Swiss-Prot record:
Cellular component annotations (GO), alphabetically ordered: transcription factor TFIIE complex
Recorded family membership: Belongs to the TFIIE alpha subunit family.
UniProt keywords, alphabetically: Initiation factor, Nucleus, Protein biosynthesis, Transcription, Transcription regulation
Location within or outside the cell: Nucleus
PROSITE patterns: HTH_TFE_IIE
Underlying gene: efuD
Keyword Transcription regulation attached: yes
Domain of life per record: Eukaryota
Name of the protein in its database record: Transcription factor efuD
Acidic residues bias: start-end ranges: 353-372, 442-454
Molecular function as annotated in GO: translation initiation factor activity
Length: 454
């Protein structure tokens, strides 16, 4: 018999009821059965069968697979639209549970249960008191070696604290060994032997497809024939219903050396290498003789290796410096173009600000226009003075004129009489009189402005 199948059947007989044993035996003989056929073999209802199978499934001894089936010759299910025509066609499927023995899963479950049972029995039978190593044959007192360490005879034997008699080692019967653990090992010796045999052999995989290929049909007879069914291989899954992709993920790995894409200063690199060389340098008491001070063979070898490393690093340093110069040249050109563009932008902005300021000043000049005030020097033809009667000049004074848009303004109009033969003395006296008249008239104008009628 197959050792895996034998282990499952013996385990069922050791820990389960008769109904569970019959289910295991039926599956071991027929390889796989659905719930209807298994209920027919055992002569029980589906409800009771599913209760028994549920415990075996929970313990991992049997496995369950659901498979879609349809009756042979059954018409497809159609749905009618508003016009009475069929709109969709679906197959009438029903899913049936098939039971089989998955050897690998059952063996792992049995090993786990055995381990848990051994731990439980060991914890229950563990002694609650400390184990005694020595016993007195006279007074039957028991001691540990630590308790009688201070009472030793000249011969090197441990002595009893009560009667000072030599102590004897405790026998195996007096150590309080766990009897339950012994009994469990004796009862499970057959199962343990089969598990050891399984560990040394190769157990074949028995999944549902393999079990179905080795299935042995049952004989129902003519009085209770089985229904003819068709197997539907396509089974709805998460990938098909949710539209998920089941293709394996592709992983790409890129390996980069230390320093790839990182700009390192050559001086910093040189200092780092020099520091590492000093750390790796041999001490002087090894590289040089402590007596004569001459370099030893080990020191000479180290010096040669250091020289070769320096030569190699020097070549690398030259290449790094050339590459660094190239990078710096490119960076300098980019920076020069950037600063030139920035300077042009600043000049354009300054010129724009200056133009705006000039426009604002022009607007201010337009708003506050200068008004010229008439004076004797500015307007010699029209002098705002009161005319003075002279023998040669007649003056007409036009007094205040009222402006329609503003306050009353004092205006004077002097009309010179045209005469022939005016003397210079008369002109001088006329100018003096005009000046006095102007001063008096300006005072009157200020008074009128201060006390203006509203």
């Amino acid at each position: 018999m197959d050792p895996a199948k034998e282990l499952i059947r013996i385990t069922a007989r050791a820990f389960y009821s008769t109904e569970h044993v019959l289910i295991i035996d039926a599956l071991a003989i027929h390889s796989t059965l659905n719930d209807i056929d298994l209920a027919h073999i055992l002569g029980m209802q589906l409800k009771g069968l599913r209760r028994l199978v549920g415990r075996l499934k929970e313990d991992g001894l049997i496995s369950v697979e659901s498979r879609g089936e349809k009756k042979e010759g059954a018409p497809p299910m159609t749905t009618l639209g508003k016009d009475g025509q069929p709109t969709s066609i679906k197959e009438r499927l029903f899913y049936r549970d098939w039971y089989y023995l998955n050897y690998h899963r059952a063996i792992d479950s049995i090993k786990y249960r055995m381990m848990k049972l051994s731990k439980y029995i060991e914890s229950q039978g563990a002694p609650t008191t400390e184990k005694k190593d020595l016993v007195c044959p006279r007074c039957k007192s028991q001691y540990t070696e630590l308790e009688v360490m201070d009472n030793i005879s000249p011969m090197g034997d441990f002595l009893c604290h009560m009667c000072q008699h030599s102590l004897d080692p405790a026998t195996e019967d007096d150590t309080g060994e766990n009897e339950n653990m012994k009994r469990l090992n004796d009862q499970l010796s057959r199962i343990v032997d089969i598990m050891r045999n399984i560990d040394s052999t190769d157990v074949p995989e028995n999944d549902f497809d393999t079990a179905l290929s080795h299935a042995l049909p049952i004989d129902r007879g003519s009085s209770n024939p089985a229904r003819r069914i068709e197997i539907v291989e396509s089974k709805p899954s998460i990938a098909s219903t949710k539209g998920l992709s089941t293709a394996p993920d592709q992983i790409s790995v890129s390996v980069m050396e230390d320093g790839d894409g990182v700009k390192i200063d050559p001086e910093e690199l040189a200092r780092r290498r020099e520091k590492e060389a000093k750390q790796n340098m041999l001490p002087e008491w090894i590289s040089k003789s402590t007596i004569s001070g001459d370099i030893t063979s080990v020191g000479a070898k180290e010096a040669a290796e250091r020289a070769s490393r320096d030569a190699h690093n020097m070549g690398l340093r030259v290449e790094d410096v050339a590459e660094d110069k190239k990078l710096r040249t490119d960076d300098d050109g980019a920076m020069d173009s950037y600063w030139a563009a920035l300077k042009a932008e600043q000049e354009r902005q300054a010129q724009q600000d200056q133009d705006e300021e000039e426009e604002e000043e022009d607007d201010d000049d337009d708003e506050f226009e200068d008004v010229d005030v008439g004076t004797a020097s500015a307007q010699p033809a029209s002098v705002p003075a009161i005319s003075v009667s002279t023998p040669a000049t007649s003056a007409q004074v036009s007094s205040t004129a009222t402006d329609e848009d503003g306050p009353a303004a004092k205006r004077t109009k002097v009309t010179e009489a045209q005469s022939n033969g005016t003397a210079p003395a008369a002109a001088a006296s006329s100018q003096a009189a005009a000046a006095e008249s102007k001063n008096g008239e300006s005072d009157e104008d200020e008074d009128e402005l201060e006390f203006e009628d509203i």
